[in-house]
Curated annotation (Swiss-Prot):
This is Dolichol kinase. The keyword NAD does not apply. It catalyses: a di-trans,poly-cis-dolichol + CTP = a di-trans,poly-cis-dolichyl phosphate + CDP + H(+). Belongs to the polyprenol kinase family. It is found in: Endoplasmic reticulum membrane. GO terms for cellular component: endoplasmic reticulum; endoplasmic reticulum membrane. GO terms for molecular function: dolichol kinase activity. It comes from Saccharomyces cerevisiae (strain ATCC 204508 / S288c). Its EC number is 2.7.1.108. Keywords: Endoplasmic reticulum, Kinase, Membrane, Transferase, Transmembrane, Transmembrane helix.
Length: 519
């Protein structure tokens, strides 16, 4: 693994004065200072703070990586699909390529061309998640990581694609090369589309590449084995298809929004019915109704969900003006936790199927809002803007609620793990509320507080202990109390020092740590 830690300082007196006089949050100041050249011997505390927060993150990430290497013994163990030796040699080569390309850009354009420190997560998260949960796709996912160095300059894109093709040639047999070349094409297109839609504001370069790799795996790389994954893959493929068709209808045939709404309403269920492949070939909607009716537990879960949402949504909307933005947003975290945890213990497969259907539904809601499709587009825009944060306001997309849904769903769908729910529903929520209200000691280099981090660790650990004690589904029976405490502590400290979106970082890292501990 390679940690990218740029030197922290300033370039000119003018830049330093401008930075110190601004009202930018500390993490934004760090991003500017870390791209400059000269070290501030005069004692600019923010420069040291940036280095400190990046150092803490690097220690945690490298520590978990080398622990993984030590446990897997890559030079001796061979899986049924691919050798761990090949996987780690490949990631080492990718790291060297990334360092080489970054150094070349620095040589040509100076410190301003260096990527953000958070670029390290574009390497760490896809590699570790793929290695621990889908080993057979680790090599291709590691190759796809190189796309994070792509830019709008065609020369850079061409160099990255050529390097990816070379890696495919050396890592795969002739029969597998075409499939993996198609993976590169799909990932590159998805990344460019996300960057274009998000304008590198709602979704920055790191977000776009992480989500493009995730979508590439869902749509193409990973095999759709379980029912919930087949449902997720089918609906997202249907959503992608109808959005593409609507784009052509709007740009080429100049369809009005009302006609696009009709096209979307008709096309999405038709394509979903086509792309969802169940084992018995049954109609997906009829299968779902039958699946729910054949179990009283599922009917009770569905009734409980409906009742809680009917009561909570109007209440939060009514009380929104009397609550702070942060508190009103975190209430949704608590509600989702209460909705899913008890239900998951009663019927985990039903919950995973429900989440697999909910993700495309929320993506559809954002598409309707983004395109302002009648009759719901304006109403959705009005309500979602009430809970939008600064990042949502900075770009065309309202992405925070989608981040939350992806964060809680991914560990459950991939590993039957409630870590995303615990980390976001309880730990992150209380860390934010307590940190903003009572926090006094700030982590160096961020706006987050030590008090908030302690709240994250303590509350997450307590919830884990409660689930360990009363968990009928045996979710945590494979973990000891000390292991749970270690997991919560590492996650809390990393969250406190990182400026990457919590809804991405916390669930993924906690899921990785949970798996590492049990290797």
């Amino acid at each position: 693994m390679v940690a990218i830690i740029p030197h922290a300082s300033f370039t000119t007196i003018k830049l330093t004065q401008k930075t110190e006089g601004s009202q930018m949050p500390t993490e934004e100041i760090c991003k500017i200072n870390m791209r400059t050249r000269k070290f501030d011997v005069g004692g600019n505390s923010r420069d040291f703070e940036c280095f400190y927060s990046n150092f803490v993150q690097t220690v945690i990430l490298l520590g978990t990586f080398f622990y993984c290497v030590e446990r897997l013994q890559p030079w001796s163990i061979v899986t049924a699909d691919i050798s761990y030796k090949q996987i780690f040699v490949n990631v080492f080569v990718v790291c060297l390529i990334m360092v080489g390309l970054i150094f070349t850009k620095y040589w040509q354009h100076g410190y301003k061309s260096l990527p953000k420190f958070d670029t390290i997560y574009s390497l760490y998260l896809p590699f570790m998640v793929s290695l621990l949960f889908d080993t057979s796709s680790t090599v291709i996912n590691t190759i796809l990581i190189l796309s994070v160095l792509n830019s709008y300059r065609w020369r850079t894109q061409l160099v990255v694609i050529i390097l990816q093709l070379c890696l495919i040639f050396f890592n795969f047999e002739a029969g597998d090369r075409l499939k993996n070349i198609i993976s590169i094409v799909i990932n590159s297109l998805l990344s460019l589309i996300l960057k274009y839609i998000g304008q590198l504001k709602s979704l920055d370069n790191i977000d776009s590449n992480l989500f493009s790799i995730l979508l590439t795996n869902i749509l193409y790389v990973s095999e759709a084995g379980t029912v919930h994954f087949r449902i997720l893959k089918g609906i997202i493929l249907a959503l992608t298809t109808i959005i593409s068709i609507n784009y052509v209808l709007k740009k080429v045939m100049h369809f009005k929004p009302f006609m696009l709404s009709i096209s979307f309403a008709i096309g999405l269920p038709l394509f979903a019915n086509t792309f969802i492949h169940l084992e018995d070939g049954e109609n997906p909607l009829l299968w779902l109704v039958k699946y729910i009716l054949e179990s009283t537990i599922r009917q009770k879960i569905l009734f409980a969900w409906s009742s809680i949402l009917i009561l909570s949504i109007p209440s939060i909307l009514i009380e929104k003006d009397s609550l702070s933005l942060n508190t009103s947003r975190k209430l949704w975290h608590f509600i989702i936790f209460l909705l899913i945890i008890p239900s998951f213990q009663m019927d985990s497969n039903f919950v995973k199927i429900a989440l697999s259907g909910t993700i495309p539904v929320f993506l559809s809601i954002e598409y309707i809002r983004f395109q302002n499709l009648p009759p719901l587009g304006s109403a959705i825009e009005l309500q979602l803007r009430r809970f939008a944060d600064d990042r949502d306001h900075s770009g065309p997309l309202i992405i925070s609620y989608l981040y939350l849904l992806f964060g809680i769903s991914t560990p459950l769908l991939m590993n039957n793990s409630p870590m995303g729910l615990i980390g976001l529903g309880i730990g992150d929520s209380l860390a934010s509320i307590i940190g903003k209200r009572y926090g006094r000691i700030r982590w160096k280099g961020t706006q987050k507080t030590l008090e908030g981090t302690l709240a994250f660790i303590v509350t997450s650990f307590i919830v884990c202990l409660v689930l360990l004690r009363f968990d009928k589904a045996a979710i945590f029976n494979h973990l000891t109390t000390l292991q749970l405490l270690t997991l919560c502590t590492l996650s809390g400290v990393l969250e406190g020092n990182s400026v990457l979106n919590d809804n991405i970082l916390i669930p993924a890292f906690m899921m990785i740590c949970e798996k590492l501990i049990t290797l």
